[in-house]
Amino acid sequence: MFAIVETGGKQYKVKEQDVIKIEKLNASVGEEVTLDKVIALADVNNNIVFTHNAIVTASVLEQCRNDKIIVFKKKRRKNYRRKNGHRQYMTVLRVTKINNME
């Protein structure tokens, strides 16, 4: 059984006991989080069912930052160069339960 959930503007295909790295959520380590925007749900035979009232429960493993990306801007022959780095805040979740409320 798997579910497709949306959080942080991205979609993730998750099963129970999966570990996923998503955009930052305001939750502390060890706290239970519910992801209620479930787009699709699949049963044991991988038959996809589109449902509106399924809930995915996950626990927060860690709050961390992603790898650094470099943003480099340049205009040729004008001596214009800018270099910036960015590290996005991320939340690591372990999916504990996929619950269909039907």
UniProtKB/Swiss-Prot annotation:
One of its GO terms (cellular component) is ribosome. Disulfide bonds: none annotated. Keywords: Ribonucleoprotein, Ribosomal protein, RNA-binding, rRNA-binding. Pfam families: Ribosomal_L21p. The keyword Ribonucleoprotein applies. InterPro entries: bL21-like, bL21-like_sf, Ribosomal_bL21, Ribosomal_bL21_CS. The keyword Membrane does not apply. GO terms for biological process: translation. It comes from the Bacteria. GO terms for molecular function: rRNA binding; structural constituent of ribosome. This protein binds to 23S rRNA in the presence of protein L20. Belongs to the bacterial ribosomal protein bL21 family. Part of the 50S ribosomal subunit. Contacts protein L20. HAMAP family: Ribosomal_bL21. NCBIfam families: L21. This is Large ribosomal subunit protein bL21. It comes from Ehrlichia chaffeensis (strain ATCC CRL-10679 / Arkansas). The gene is rplU.
